[in-house]
Amino acid sequence: MRKFNVNVNGTVYTVEVEEVGGAVTAAPAAPAAPAAAPAAAPVAAAPAAAPAPAPAAAPAAAPAPAAKPAAAAPAGSVTVSAPMPGKILSVNVKPGDKVEAGDVLLILEAMKMQNEIMAPEDGTVSEVRVNAGDTVATGDVMVIL
């Protein structure tokens, strides 16, 4: 048994963990690292040039158009974005509604679970960008207060 102190949100917990086959895992890891490091140094120079252009080209084309519509929120407003991808089951507010911090704005279904999306602060709903049945991606703006 090994003991660890784990800090979660400022609270320290003492955790005991039982090692199961720990010696077997540690032995192959040590020889693999030195063998990979010398082999990677000469080979890394050639492959590094090929992968770098491919990832740079793909993200530049796709995220740029998606970011511009999401960033069009009025100054001084609060945006409520999707914390995870999912499907909008219901929208509980409409433009002009006054909401308080913690009020449920909409229900987002993700991984077969219904998640209540709540107002982060008091305000008035100025825009609702989703409808029931819409699919959203992580970071999509759903409501503007």
Curated annotation (Swiss-Prot):
Domain named Biotinyl-binding: residues: 77-145
UniProt keyword terms in alphabetical order: Biotin, Decarboxylase, Ion transport, Lyase, Sodium, Sodium transport, Translocase, Transport
Family annotation (InterPro entries): Biotin_BS (IPR001882), Biotin_Carboxyl_Carrier/Decarb (IPR050709), Biotin_lipoyl (IPR000089), Single_hybrid_motif (IPR011053)
Pathway: Amino-acid degradation; L-glutamate degradation via hydroxyglutarate pathway; crotonoyl-CoA from L-glutamate: step 5/5
GO biological process, one term: sodium ion transport
Enzyme Commission (EC) number: 7.2.4.5
The protein's enzyme class: translocase
Region (Disordered): 52-82
Keyword Transport: yes
Co-factor requirement: biotin
Described purpose of this protein according to its UniProt entry: Biotin carrier subunit of the primary sodium pump glutaconyl-CoA decarboxylase (GCD).
Assembly and binders: Heterooctamer consisting of two alpha, two beta, two gamma and two delta subunits.
Protein name according to UniProt: Glutaconyl-CoA decarboxylase subunit gamma
Source taxonomy: Bacteria, Bacillati, Bacillota, Negativicutes, Acidaminococcales
